[in-house]
Amino acid sequence: MKMKKIAAAMALSCLILSATAFAEEAQDRTVQQCFQKDELIVLDKQDVAGGKGTLHGLFSFTRDMAKPEQAIKEIGWMRLEKGSSIGLHKHGVNEDAYIIISGEGIFTDGDGNDTVVHAGDITIARAGQSHALRNEKDEPLIFLDVIAQNDGLQK
């Protein structure tokens, strides 16, 4: 019986230590300067902001990992397949830039104006502005998404 208690205590200690190591790794991720493709966090989201389909994402880090003093809260490679979209949504205190890498999309600004976007185009929604993006073409729409926030605006 004593051996079982010792083994259980050792297992619990290992579990606590490994959880602490993973927590530290997640916290340190936002100060990391280079992210290899195989290190990226896979995060797919459904029907984003009232849009349709799946938004496929590969992130260096996500906004829940960022510290208040870090302006860039999230960076990710994003992919929308044909028929998929990010619905029209308003940004409160953060800003969201899309850098189009490949494919063709339709960007909708806060006034409801549609603009066709291609590789090399950049869109941005500042705090207080709205935007949306959709893919109506057969080729996937690939873009880099950068979300930044000035936490001083919240005070």
Features from the language model and the residues they span:
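Bacterial N-terminal signal peptides that target proteins for export
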Residues: M1-A9
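Bacterial N-terminal signal peptides
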Residues: A9-S18
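A short, N-terminal "cap"/entry segment at the start of jelly-roll beta-barrel domains
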Residues: F22-I72, G87, Q154-K155
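Short histidine-centered beta-strand/loop micro-motifs
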Residues: P68-Q70, I86-H91, D109, R134-N135
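Short, conserved beta-strand element in jelly-roll/cupin
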Residues: W77-E81, G92-F107
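Short acidic-glycine-tyrosine-enriched beta hairpin
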Residues: G112-A127
